[in-house]
Swiss-Prot record:
List of residues that carry Leucine amide: L33
Site features described as Pharmacophore key residue, chain residue numbers: W28, R30
Organism: Selenotypus sp.
Family: Belongs to the neurotoxin 10 (Hwtx-1) family. 22 (Htx-4) subfamily.
Name by which UniProt lists this protein: Mu-theraphotoxin-Ssp1a
Source species, domain of life: Eukaryota
Domain notes: The presence of a 'disulfide through disulfide knot' structurally defines this protein as a knottin.
Membrane-crossing segments per the record: none
Amino acid sequence: DCLGWFSGCDPNNNKCCEGYVCHWKYPWCRYDL
């Protein structure tokens, strides 16, 4: 199971769905703009 849009995530263990990024400053799944 991957994490969807705006789910809290761990930048060191990114489990976001494909197409999303997890940044240390913004620790939630979001589009890579």
